[in-house]
Amino acid sequence: MFKSLPEEEAFRALTLTLQLVASLHDIVAYTFSFAKLGNCPACFDLPLSPNPLMRDWGGAEGIGNELQELQKMIDSLQRPQDPSQVAQALLLRREVTLLQFDAAMRHLLRTFLAAGNAPAYQSVAESACYGLPPLSNALGKSIFSSQLSLPQPLDPWSPQAFALFPWRAFLEDGGPFPVISSVPDTLEYDMQMCLCGLSDCDRRVAHGELVGVQMLMEDVLLGSCHVIRKASTEWQAALDNAQPDWSKLPGLYPNQLESHPKASALLEGQCDVVMSLSLLKSFLILWKRLEVLKEHWGRFKLRGQDINSALLHRQFSELYEAEILYPSMKALARQMGKEDEFEELMLRSQSILPPKGASEIEIKTQQLQKLLESLEIHMIQEVLRKVNREMTLFLSEKSKEESTLPTDRWKHQVMKENFSVMRPQIVERFVQRLMEDSQDDGPKITFRREHLEACILSLGCDVMARERSNFETYSMCYEHILQHTRQKLSQKEQEVDLLRRSQVPSEDCAGQVAELSHDMIMEITALRAQLTDLEEENLNLKIQIRKEVQEEYRELVQALFLTCLRIKEKLDENQFNLIQKVCELIGEVRAEGIANVKQLKKTWGSARPDEETKENTAKEQLCALEQDHSSTLAALLCKARSLGRWRLAVQQAHLRGQLSRAEMESILSKKECLRIKLMAEQEAALLHQQLLAARQALTKAQTDNRKLWRQNDTQAQLLRELEHRVTQDSVTRQQLDIIKTSGMEKLLKDVEQKEQKLQLLTEEAERASKRGQLQQKKMDRDLKQMRNRLAQERSVKLDAFQRVQELQSQLYDIQWPSVQMGSPVGLRSQTHCSLSSASTLSRHPHHHFSKTHFVGSKMTRRIQRPKTVPVKHNRRIEDGSLPSVKENVQLTTFQAQTAPSGISFRPESFSS
């Protein structure tokens, strides 16, 4: 394709072509695979299938729209005619689609767990373990990479490795068989593997998750448009100058992002396509890292349990919301200046929602940072626990009375220094074992090889056992001697310390006595203070108990007082009601009596006037009204008295409570004052001790200062010598570095030469294979020609053979006239048949050569003659007439007699 171009330009053009073709192939393959996820395979196998494509998963319209959007994306580039820019955009599109499908599958697992759909979760989890890794950017090593591996610091994906070791980098990620071009495309199989075990309902849920992730990508792109516009010019130059690792061509698939009109308009117009795809790629990578860290953090919080059930997922969600989500959202709201609004939103809603105006990138970044902080804190705590554990073990071993290692418990019992080593019977045992299976033949003694080897092996074991026992005994003896000397040395050191302490001057002794007496006085005062505190506490407890009892009885008295008041009120009410009822009854009786008196007066004719009766009734009514008024006033007076008593009791209870609180505060203030006094005395004592310690430290510092001045001079001299050594070492290191760099350069040159030689050898091998193929074709042609020649020669030889047979038959007829006289008809018929067959073979050699074995067998029967023909005569005729035909005739006769009837005489059988 690019043979007319120079080598470098042809290589670059071929690389760009492969990049474009690989990316476009994966995009189209993903488009069809995505449509097949919701449709039956027969819709794509048959061009005129009656089953229509489902539009939920794209369908035919979705495939067409996807390809149109892809063309629009390429046209919206700054330089759509530049193949490198187009290849870069297609590669980013493919990577974004890969990460989008991966994020959708991970979110689908969380959705199934949150809904409690355990079978669907198990199916997707088991299938994704096999389906997602081939779709990711995992390394696929070749079977030849073990022989030609990359050096250790280099990464197979780095441009440096691809530039220095292109073939080895290709083998590190080119699949198991990188040279074979007929590797099947497993993209559709891997996508279907992730969703193969789902039902129709669960498959619709999966489709909803895919669409949801797609809409989330559109929201991220719309929310970050200003960032893309701002950094478009800077990133474009960096992306143009960057050389991506094009050796990695994993099977990826297209993005469904631009199906939304807003996102497509964004990609086409205002924002740069490459910047948009780069932003989406970074967001998806951030999301994947967050999901992986969430899974690891959840497993750590749940003590190593996998989150594979609804209960565990609920526990994980609660822990994550409390420890990660809420702090991260609160920090984000604080950064945005909306902390109060966030708190109000948290109070109004039960769930944790992000603050208004926060983008998805900021939300996930905050969660990722919080997860990393939590994991770092956990790691630091684990390290601190381990350090504390080791320190406790170290201190426990150090605090033992005997400074011996813990290996002493595995040692033997204590032995004395004077011991004697027993002489092992090694030689005697060896001789005894050797002579057990020996054969004595007088002056010679023979042994079997296996027996001798076994005896030598046992001898070696005995010798090693003796050496080990000697080592153990001597080491124990030396260790016990050292332990004894150490004990004696420690005793001597203790005696020396006691002597030094006994020789302390009198001033120091007086100071020590004063300090001891002061300490004793302080202890006595502290004990007295504690005793007084205890006595006061005892009194306070008694008073408090009395007050509690009084309060309890006071409450009872108040309750009784209230009940008495209520009973008295009820009695007053009853009395008032009773008086009213009695008055009413009296009034009624009086009215009835007056009425009766009036009636009697009317009947009997009384002489008194009615005015007196009227005055009496008026007076009685006034008296009744006054009595009612006085009774109401008495009831009000009783109520006022009871209310006043109740108020007085409440005020007394309130004042008693204030008095008890004031007493408690006074007691606490007294305790605090006493504690402050004790603390002041203790601080004074501590300051006095610190002053003495400072004086002693000052004297020690003066002595140490003199020593340090002396050591400084010696260290200065040593430092000069060390500087001289360091300079010499630096010179030698520089020389070694120069030698190493030169050696590395030589090694790199050798490696490049070897790679060039390897490429030349591979080219020569290909050329040799081509030459071998050409030679094979030439040999096939020569073989065909030889077969044709042999067929012709065979036909000629068969003609000659027939002629020889005719001559032999004529000779036989001449020599045996009696036989000829006996059967002339049969012989003539045989001769005629042989002549006719010979003539037909001579005229049509190729047709007769392809006949079946039946014709050959007939011909062989005709050729057979009686055995009475003289052998010498036959040999003379054969040797004299046709010597070259003899072997072929015998071979033909033998094959005709021994071959089965189903095998035909073909030229291939004779040519071989």
UniProtKB/Swiss-Prot annotation:
Keywords: Coiled coil
Recorded coiled-coil stretches: 1-35, 220-276
Keyword hit for Coiled coil: yes
InterPro entries: CCDC162
Name assigned to this protein: Coiled-coil domain-containing protein 162
Species of origin: Mus musculus
Chain's gene name: Ccdc162
